[in-house]
Amino acid sequence: AWLAELGMEGRDIVKERIEKSLSGAKTWVLIGGPPCQAYSLVGRSRMIGEDKGKYEKDPRHFLYREYLQILADHRPTVFVMENVKGLLSAKLNQQSTFKKILADLQNPSLAMSGTTQGKNLSYKLFSISRRGSGNLFNEPDPGDFVVRSEEYGIPQARHRIIILGIRSDVYVSDPDLLQITQKV
């Protein structure tokens, strides 16, 4: 295991370290998430209160692209990305940050380079806690990705966004949902 702060380590170092760790493995899972300060309600209100222009220019809005780069470079079979619930309401230049992240996660090579560069890489995205509230095209509603930990036996009321991505070329069927358990 390696704990790295994406955005602080150089991309070449991250790429080399992951390649070495994978040792040619074709089936693996990436678990992690970008820093949440730019998306958390507390962080946003503090920054917007100080200076809205400063908030709009905060480079932490784009740290999720470091995660995308790992997806594009290493093509994990499955990924699990976690972040704070405040991401659902975060906006940058009047655009939903969450919807942009979802679109980018579906096609990380395209998002990172503007082209697939011969890589046909795409992911199907899933909620692990809810299904069926999306539109006619079976696209999930952003709220579907919120996991309410207290509904799954965890003794705290912490709500998190969790996105499960399965590489399209290995996708067979939708994953099972978490089962609600008795509260602790």
Annotate the PLM regions.
Residues 33-34, 75:
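Hydrophobic alpha-helix-in-membranes signature
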Residues 31-33, 164:
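Structural recognition of the conserved hydrophobic beta-strand(s) that form the central parallel beta-sheet
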